[in-house]
Amino acid sequence: MQPESAMTPALEVTVLVSIGRHPLTGRVRRADQDARGVELARSLADAEVRLLHAGECNESSEAALRGYLGMGFSELALIEQPEGADVLPALAEALDATSPHLVITGERAERGEGSGLLPYLLAERLGWPLVSGLAAVESVEDGMATLLQALPRGQRRRLKIRLPAIVTVDDAAPTPRQSAYGPARRGTLESSAGEVCNDDEWATWQVQPARPRPKRLKIVKAASARDRFKAAAAKAEGTGGQVLTDVTPTQGAEAILTLLRDEEVLR
């Protein structure tokens, strides 16, 4: 018989996955950031990775969820929730019951409200630390994880946090592998009932197609790494606008609103 320490994984990881939406066609798919989180979890040594989804299960959503199974998993835990339900209580209950060391999720959902607040609300309810913009997990030792956080302009910051913890990933995380058709079809969705809490605020919202995007501010384009570095290091050149000093908060707010209207961010 093997010792218990050899049978117990050094790191238990739960990846929260959601149903994505293709930005051009609108078809359901695996969410890009969640898939990056799955890829990141698979790269961890001595880790037992579990996939968890809370939501409605139908033909289209099942096809999207099987996209995660096609990344090399035999099963996915599904907490059935009706459309429009608040999945926070069900996810918190499931995570509290399984007590993983690390929970990985995307920054925000591609469908529905998409506020990006779910990881923060989960961390608040469970009392766990949260790190956003994760790029890599460097090491896990003695209940502490060394993480690499992505910052603007390609910078990275090394952090140490105590487990259990919740981390979110964005486009800086590893590119997800292609989903394999065979494993995706052979994998199973382990359905279970969870606490249902209606989202009364979301029910009052009106959802409609987004308007054309507003005019973007000037972006410096560079063809080489040297040019990109020079553009990042150079001081911004003033091409208009004004510098406000010794003004009241009301005057400052009015100036900001005027700029946003001029740039057609607000109408």
Curated annotation (Swiss-Prot):
It comes from the Bacteria. One of its GO terms (molecular function) is electron transfer activity. Keywords: Electron transport, Transport. Disruption phenotype: Deletion mutant loses its ability to grow using DMG as the sole nitrogen source but is still capable of utilizing sarcosine and glycine as the sole nitrogen source. Participates in the electron transfer process during N,N-dimethylglycine (DMG) degradation to sarcosine. Belongs to the ETF beta-subunit/FixA family. Heterodimer of an alpha and a beta subunit. This is Electron transfer flavoprotein subunit beta. It comes from Chromohalobacter salexigens (strain ATCC BAA-138 / DSM 3043 / CIP 106854 / NCIMB 13768 / 1H11).
